[in-house]
């Protein structure tokens, strides 16, 4: 899809994507069907892409309909087609009559009347959609709202299946939706009930709000950036003429060199690199990549300065974190490097853009505390106050990284012109902020809209001739790298899952000790790891990688194949549900209400997009455990682990136990 026309081939597998959870229709059936179902997908055949393609984003659907209307008018009016501004017609735009695009019809024929009626209905649908578009919202917002509705519907069904399904649904909702949600609470929270507060006080317990006010340690003044160590280490570490071959001093240089020779390979043995580099994986991986790409030369970065900065940066990753440490940063950086090498992207990005993407991957989790954004917000942390609860960790990572550049001997961009430096800084900020997992749906919607619009337009080529389009691809590229663990060889994937779950459990332990509500997937006594991985792949990872694979087709097919094999493994490892135990004296005791309620602004926009849908524009779905799951995917849930850096962020829906805690 980028700067080249790919040959026709088989469609990419869409086995587990939530895009497939609704029926698909051929574009030439649109006029009769789409008026009754706003969630339907278009299926078009493109000679310029790869077989049959599903169109799900609203803007691309409108564009496809208008192209169909145009072709129908050519058939109805016998007006010669003008080639001044239109690309050649695609076979996907054939009319319902079965005639090729532009084939003349005679008045009075049944096919003529049917085609005229279909054309009017299709044009009316397009007008309805265009009339409801708000001028202050982008076309990508239309897709994002639609995807949220699809995801909410599926999570509601899944939450009905079991307590674990409810917990997993809550995790996905709270992690991957970027809007703060309003909650319909079935009962008072502990800290809102005076009697419960008094009882807990007598027992020596505290609510989350009380704990935050009385126990939160005072951080540094907000005029300073917390987490920056003083004095900074490694300022003058490399004073000699000879620099280490791979950027780090290690007695196992030969073994390390062998592994680093595979940096362009997907699924490198990153854990061995961490061992052979004496726990300096980020420094050696970044140094080797920048050397091999000749970025030190093209960006005029002194090698000694680069190593000073990278060593200082790596020191500011928290080594005690099981997951969010410098090894994870090295893994994301190496994955970003491989994705930048994909043939479809050859020659697309400048050295400044490539260097910016790799730099963003290096710094994207620096000084991560091993806690989620939502934990920092709930505990009224200094960081949450500083960044107004918005992308708290991501803003902090950026602030720390750019502050480290100001340290003497660490400014790797010192030789850049002011304009270049400003451009790179803007790129890095945009990319790192996009690693906030609550932005996932917006990123996916943007990418899907871009890909499908080009498919419908018939070009099959993305020019990427402006900053918005170029940074959008780079943001999604690094986002894919950050969510790449489920696409790696199974032994690596399983190891990452174990590390991430341990970090989640450590947060859950803190929450339990502090009297706070335990976050979804953070209770080590109530974990559903295998099931969560299946759902995480089905609802989050596969849709993202599927769309990326469409963009760079066919370069990511092997990655998709591995992803599906890993999904099947975890599906096979889900333990059977325990048999029902005796008679439940109080069947309501264990029932948990799951509810997804969108913001008022999102409700209004969804209502506009869904007018005429059988749901009547409602944006709230409710279910309870103990009923049969209506999900189209067997065993699908969500969230869990193994998706590099995926941690619950701001916003989302909550499970509210009707009787006590989770």
Swiss-Prot record:
Residues flagged as site, Binds AMP, but not cAMP: 485
Annotated Acidic residues bias: 599-616
Protein name: 3',5'-cyclic-AMP phosphodiesterase, isoform F
Reaction(s) catalysed by this chain's protein: 3',5'-cyclic AMP + H2O = AMP + H(+)
Domain PDEase: 248-577
Biological or metabolic pathway of the protein: Purine metabolism; 3',5'-cyclic AMP degradation; AMP from 3',5'-cyclic AMP: step 1/1
Any single Gene Ontology cellular-component annotation: synapse
Family label: Belongs to the cyclic nucleotide phosphodiesterase family. PDE4 subfamily.
Lineage, top ranks: Eukaryota, Metazoa, Ecdysozoa, Arthropoda, Hexapoda
A Gene Ontology molecular function term of the record: metal ion binding
Gene name as annotated: dnc
Keyword Metal-binding: yes
């Amino acid at each position: 899809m980028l700067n080249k026309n790919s040959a026709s081939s088989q469609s990419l597998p869409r086995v587990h994507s939530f895009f497939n959870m609704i029926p698909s229709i051929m574009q030439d059936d649109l006029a009769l069907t789409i008026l009754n179902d706003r969630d339907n997908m278009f299926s078009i055949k493109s000679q310029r892409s790869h077989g049959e393609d599903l169109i799900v984003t609203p803007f691309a659907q409108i564009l496809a309909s208008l192209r169909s209307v145009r072709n129908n008018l050519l058939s109805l009016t016998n007006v010669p087609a003008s080639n001044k501004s239109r690309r050649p017609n695609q076979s996907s735009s054939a009319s319902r009559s079965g005639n090729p695009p532009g084939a003349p019809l005679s008045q009075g024929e049944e096919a003529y009347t049917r085609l005229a009626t279909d054309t009017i209905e299709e044009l009316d649908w397009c007008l309805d959609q265009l009339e409801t578009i708000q001028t202050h919202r982008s076309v990508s917002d239309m897709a994002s709202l639609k995807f949220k509705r699809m995801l909410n519907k599926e999570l509601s069904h899944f939450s009905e299946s079991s307590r674990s399904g409810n917990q997993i649904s809550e995790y996905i909702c709270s992690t991957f939706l970027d809007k703060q949600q309003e909650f319909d609470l079935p009962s008072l929270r502990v800290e809102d009930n005076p009697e419960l507060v008094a009882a807990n006080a007598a027992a020596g317990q505290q609510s989350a709000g009380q704990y935050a006010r009385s126990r939160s340690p005072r951080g540094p003044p907000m005029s300073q950036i917390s987490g920056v160590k003083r004095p900074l280490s490694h300022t003058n570490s490399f004073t000699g003429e000879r620099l280490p071959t791979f950027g780090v001093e290690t007695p196992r240089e030969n073994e390390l060199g062998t592994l680093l020779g595979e940096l362009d390979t997907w699924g490198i043995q990153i854990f061995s690199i961490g061992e052979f580099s004496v726990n300096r994986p980020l420094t050696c991986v970044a140094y080797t990549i920048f050397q091999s790409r000749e970025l030190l030369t093209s960006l005029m970065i002194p090698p000694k300065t680069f190593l000073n900065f990278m060593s200082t940066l790596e020191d500011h990753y928290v080594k005690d974190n099981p997951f969010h440490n410098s090894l994870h940063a090295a893994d994301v950086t190496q994955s970003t490097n491989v994705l930048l090498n994909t043939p479809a992207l050859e020659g697309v990005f400048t050295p400044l853009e490539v260097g910016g993407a790799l730099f963003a991957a290096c710094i994207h989790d620096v000084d991560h505390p091993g806690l989620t954004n939502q934990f920092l917000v709930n505990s009224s942390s200094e960081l949450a106050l500083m960044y107004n609860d918005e992308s708290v960790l991501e803003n902090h990572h950026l602030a720390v990284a750019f502050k480290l550049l100001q340290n003497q001997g660490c400014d790797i961009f010192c030789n850049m012109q002011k304009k270049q430096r400003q451009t790179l800084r803007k790129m890095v900020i945009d990319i790192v902020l996009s690693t906030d997992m609550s932005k996932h749906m917006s990123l996916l919607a943007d990418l899907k809209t871009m890909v499908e619009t080009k498919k419908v337009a018939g070009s099959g080529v993305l020019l990427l001739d402006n900053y918005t389009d170029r940074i959008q691809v780079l943001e999604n590229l690094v986002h894919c790298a950050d969510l790449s663990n489920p696409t790696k060889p199974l032994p690596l994937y399983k190891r990452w899952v174990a590390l991430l779950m341990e970090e989640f459990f450590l947060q859950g332990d803190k929450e339990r000790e502090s009297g706070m509500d335990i976050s979804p997937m953070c209770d080590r006594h109530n974990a559903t790891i295998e099931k969560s991985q299946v759902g995480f792949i089905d609802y989050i990872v596969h849709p993202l990688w599927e769309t990326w694979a469409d963009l760079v087709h066919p370069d990511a097919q092997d990655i998709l194949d591995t992803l599906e094999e890993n999904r099947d493994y975890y599906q096979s490892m889900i333990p059977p549900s325990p048999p029902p135990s005796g008679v439940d004296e109080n069947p309501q005791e264990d029932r948990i209400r799951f509810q997804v309620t969108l913001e008022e602004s999102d409700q209004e926009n969804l209502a506009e997009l869904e007018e005429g849908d059988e749901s009547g524009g409602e944006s709230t779905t409710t279910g309870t455990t103990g009923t049969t799951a209506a999900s189209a995917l067997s065993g699908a849930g969500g969230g869990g682990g193994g998706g590099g850096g995926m941690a619950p962020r701001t916003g989302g829906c909550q499970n509210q136990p009707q009787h006590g805690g989770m």
